[in-house]
Each structure stands twice: as C-alpha cells, then as structure tokens.
Amino acid sequence: DRICTGITSSNSPHVVKTATQGEVNVTGVIPLTTTPTKSHFANLKGTKTRGKLCPKCLNCTDLDVALGRPKCMGTIPSAKASILHEVKPVTSGCFPIMHDRTKXRQLPNLLRGYENIRLSTHNVINAETAPGGPYKIGTSGSCPNITNGNGFFATMAWAVPKNDNNKTATNPLTVEVPYICTEGEDQITVWGFHSDNETQMVKLYGDSKPQKFTSSANGVTAHYVSQIGGFPNQAEDGGLPQSGRIVVDYMVQKSGKTGTITYQRGILLPQKVWCASGRSKVIKGSLPLIGEADCLHEKYGGLNKSKPYYTGEHAKAIGNCPIWVKTPLKLANGTKYRPPAKLLKER
C-alpha cells in the first residue's frame, strides 16, 4: 500500500513577512493595499464640499469675493470640507494691491477654514464721520458696480477728506472697531490704506509724506508705513490705469472684542465684516468637483476606499481615507505552506 499526506501538492506563490519568522510561504493571502491613480477632485461623500467661495460669482477670484468686489457679491455656501484651488491667489480685479506687504493673500484661505461664512448686513463704523473727517467715500472707475458706475470694495471705505478745511496733514488718529456679529462668530475685519505719488497725495489728502497705520485685535498688532510714489501705471482686469496702490490687511476679532485702527491720511476704513463659525477641513486641489468620493487626497484627487491601506505618494488627505504605508501589506487567510510529502516506500 501507499500512504499520502492530505495537503496540496502545488507550489505556493504567496510570501508574507512575519514579525517572528521573517518571510513565510502561505497557501492564501488577501491584499490590504492599493496604489491609487490620479483622478478629478470630487465632493466628499456625506459632507458638503466647497470649491469656489462663491460658486455663483462668475469671473471672480476667491480674493475678489473675500474683499467684496462689487460684481463679486454672493452667498458663500456652508461646507465641512473646502478645496484650496488658488495656491497663489491672483490679484483682485478691482484696484492694484501691494500683496507682498501684508497677509492679504491669506484672507481667502482663512475664510475657507470656516464652515459658515456670511457678510454683515451693515457697516461696522460710519466712515464719513470717523476721526479726521468729515470724509467723502472714494470710488474708482476701475472698480465698477453692478450698474457699471464707479465703485469700491464692500469691506472697505476709501476715506478722502471732504473739503479743503480738513485736507491737511494729521497726527495719528484712532478709531475703535466694535464687534457686530450676532451669533458669537469670529469677526474678520478687512481694512487698508491707499498711497500714490506726491502730486496725487497732496491733491487727495493735503500731505505728501509717508503715512503711518496700525491695527490691533485679539492680541495681534500690525504696523505699516505707506510708500509714496514709484509705482508704474497699472490696470486691473481691463480697468483704468492707476498710479496709486492699496495695501490690504485684516484682523480677527473674537466674540465681544473690540479692535482698534490708528491711521493717518489714505485710510481704507472697515465697512462690512465677515462673520464666520465652525471648522471646514481644507485641502489643496483643483476644480471642477466631479462626482463623489470617500476621500480627497492632495496628490491623487478623489479616491474611493477599496482597501484599508495604500502605497505611493504620501500627502494630506481628508475623509474616509486609506492609511499610507511604505510597502504593500497582505493578510494571510490560509495556512503555512508545506511542500508535498514524499511517498513512503512500499512495505
């Protein structure tokens, strides 16, 4: 008679690494990893996802929306996840801005980090009667409103001395900026200042010297001195050429907290403010958002989770995402492989 062992006689192609025995051949494995391929970014399943700050504001950058450019006013939808699609936001199309002097480029990114964002229905201060006034509110043909008349950003008032009596140099003046949001939100208050060449500075403000500006809120203070002249004429988005520039900044005021702005001539006083609450997870990506996905990954776009782990490029991801591992993982679902037993000799 011949006696045979009851195991498979085929070779095992499966090798797993174990903690105690190193590489081991097994009779079966379940792959636990996948290597994604790049895809479009998508809406995160089960979550409101925000692409542009204002989806219905056509031909507007997120910076336009954040500053309140006249033709870029609209509702910002609530969202638990937001796509940072403008890595370096382009300049606003309303008036030449000196971006490199402040954190103005960060304003859209700041807003994206909130779940709920709304613009106040009324102004935070009366700019016409602010210290150093009376003022007339300046507008620009480069910043047309919805009726194509001259306009300016909704978040700021360009305070130009109203008559020759107060069109003079001034010592630093201070205005308090109250908290006006009504639901305990963070108040994001936008402000800035305008400067031009000496001739225009005298014409507008009665003073051609550099002007000083300071803002303070929530323990954060910023100081600026305006630059006079040296600007080439610049037109934004088909507007009129401008010899002047504006510097834009913002301050975050917590519930009930008052901020202050100290200024001289050329101030852009805060007007409508952003009231923002909740948190929205932000990830770098691209638009448009197509379909839905379990996970949004900076390198791969929208991913649907088919395995618990993934290999490939490691980057920030949000949602129901697989976990990055350096090498593929396998789960053994069979037994340790043993080579076929040799037949016993006949007795």
Curated annotation (Swiss-Prot):
One of its GO terms (biological process) is symbiont entry into host cell. It is found in: Virion membrane; Host apical cell membrane. InterPro entries: Capsid_hemagglutn, Hemagglutn_HA1_a/b_dom_sf, Hemagglutn_influenz_A/B. In natural infection, inactive HA is matured into HA1 and HA2 outside the cell by one or more trypsin-like, arginine-specific endoprotease secreted by the bronchial epithelial cells. One identified protease that may be involved in this process is secreted in lungs by club cells. Palmitoylated. Keywords: Disulfide bond, Fusion of virus membrane with host endosomal membrane, Fusion of virus membrane with host membrane, Glycoprotein, Hemagglutinin, Host cell membrane, Host membrane, Host-virus interaction, Lipoprotein, Membrane, Palmitate, Transmembrane, Viral attachment to host cell, Viral envelope protein, Viral penetration into host cytoplasm, Virion, Virus entry into host cell. One of its GO terms (molecular function) is host cell surface receptor binding. SUPFAM superfamilies: Viral protein domain. Its main location: virion. It comes from the Viruses. Glycans are attached at N25, N59, N145, N166, N304, N333. Disulfide bonds: none annotated. One of its GO terms (cellular component) is virion membrane. Pfam families: Hemagglutinin (PF00509). It is a single-pass type I membrane protein. Binds to sialic acid-containing receptors on the cell surface, bringing about the attachment of the virus particle to the cell. Plays a major role in the determination of host range restriction and virulence. Class I viral fusion protein. Responsible for penetration of the virus into the cell cytoplasm by mediating the fusion of the membrane of the endocytosed virus particle with the endosomal membrane. Low pH in endosomes induce an irreversible conformational change in HA2, releasing the fusion hydrophobic peptide. Several trimers are required to form a competent fusion pore. Major glycoprotein, comprises over 80% of the envelope proteins present in virus particle. Belongs to the influenza viruses hemagglutinin family. Homotrimer of disulfide-linked HA1-HA2. This is Hemagglutinin. The gene is HA.
